[in-house]
């Protein structure tokens, strides 16, 4: 089973994808971890690296190619990244979108990265604008189009343990006999 988890920074992707993978006995791959490793290799913050990526499209393409290869060649995995749902094409069994109010996301990021909330919020908004622009330019993806996802959740409504219960219940309720089909991924062009 391939499950993708996508959403904006601070939406709980990493925490909940790791918890879901653990609960289901699946592997977990985080695009955010890969991106942060790439930033650290260049001695940059994720925000600086995002801005650098605007000038060097190969950075996004390298990351996205790796994630696409993982999504299309592996099973028994929870793949988590901003574009995981899109990059998995039709290979994903479930595509989830996580979100939360920007104030909540900024608080989470501030706590994780040990920085002031107002700084985390400003950086998050810059990062999101940067990513939205690049995804449209590179692949013709409208990151705000949630129609490809099987379910979208506001993660601010549950704590992580309870939210994983919600996700597992969603997966358990799935009945292949009543499945009328996944939302297709159309109109995008992957140029890695």
UniProtKB/Swiss-Prot annotation:
It catalyses: CMP + ATP = CDP + ADP; dCMP + ATP = dCDP + ADP. One of its GO terms (biological process) is pyrimidine nucleotide metabolic process. It comes from Halorubrum lacusprofundi (strain ATCC 49239 / DSM 5036 / JCM 8891 / ACAM 34). Keywords: ATP-binding, Cytoplasm, Kinase, Nucleotide-binding, Transferase. Belongs to the cytidylate kinase family. Type 2 subfamily. Its EC number is 2.7.4.25. GO terms for molecular function: ATP binding; CMP kinase activity; dCMP kinase activity. Its main location: cytoplasm. ATP binds at residues 7-15. This is Cytidylate kinase. Pfam families: Cytidylate_kin2.
